[in-house]
Amino acid sequence: MKLCGFEVGLDQPLFLIAGPCVIESMQLQLDVAGKLKEITGKLGVNFIFKSSFDKANRTSGTSFRGPGLEEGLKVLDAVKRQIGVPVLTDVHEYTPMNEVAAVVDVLQTPAFLVRQTDFIKNVCAAGKPVNIKKGQFLAPWDMKPVVDKAKSTGNAQIMVCERGASFGYNNLVSDMRSLSVMRDTGCPVVFDATHSVQLPGGQGSSSGGQREFVPVLARAAVAVGISGLFAETHPDPSKALSDGPNAWPLDRMEELLETLMELDAVTKKHGFARFA
């Protein structure tokens, strides 16, 4: 599949979707995007910048949600033009899809909305590549009907994303078998290494996280074989306005990516024979 001018798939090098969880300010987004472009350019990694203009599913109604659609699109457009990288953002049921699609290169659907048929179809009908996040409550094989809905719009540029599965209360686990299972959708598979270490609602009025396990799960996913890695990052996760506990520090992105790209090359060297 071609995405933002480059090929993605299990016969292609790992690509990266990364950026702060939410748009905090114009300058922060430009700084992070610029640093990520520098890192990925050095390592030869295809890169898509990610950030959200509205986090509609925050645990608390008083938590920071973002700058909103109008200001958020201005920021994403500035990142795209000034830094020169493609951009991705997530959309919601109330989002004017065509307005967002006029600015961003890739649309993303939140995990909680994966079963909303009309929503999935509306997003995919906008004509942009779409990254569909698997719900924390959904079996990996249940992504096939979701993809069928998405592709019924005529949009063939669909990716599926694993972001962990609910394991009791306030906890997620990553079943690496799901990465193999979701290949059967015929779509490139992306692994979300940062939301997979989230502890949903684990801090009462906000979600916790165990960012120390980001490299553990990222290495495991790359060893299984994935097309892309999703990772939220921040210069100072302790001060991030959303999902700081599971964000990976920006100053450690290069060392993480360097390891993952080496592992990715080894994993993909001999292909992916199906085991009986």
UniProtKB/Swiss-Prot annotation:
It is an enzyme of class 2 (transferase). One of its GO terms (biological process) is keto-3-deoxy-D-manno-octulosonic acid biosynthetic process. Its EC number is 2.5.1.55. Gene3D superfamilies: Aldolase class I. Keywords: Cytoplasm, Lipopolysaccharide biosynthesis, Transferase. SUPFAM superfamilies: Aldolase (SSF51569). GO terms for cellular component: cytoplasm. Belongs to the KdsA family. This is 2-dehydro-3-deoxyphosphooctonate aldolase. It comes from Xanthomonas oryzae pv. oryzae (strain PXO99A). The gene is kdsA.
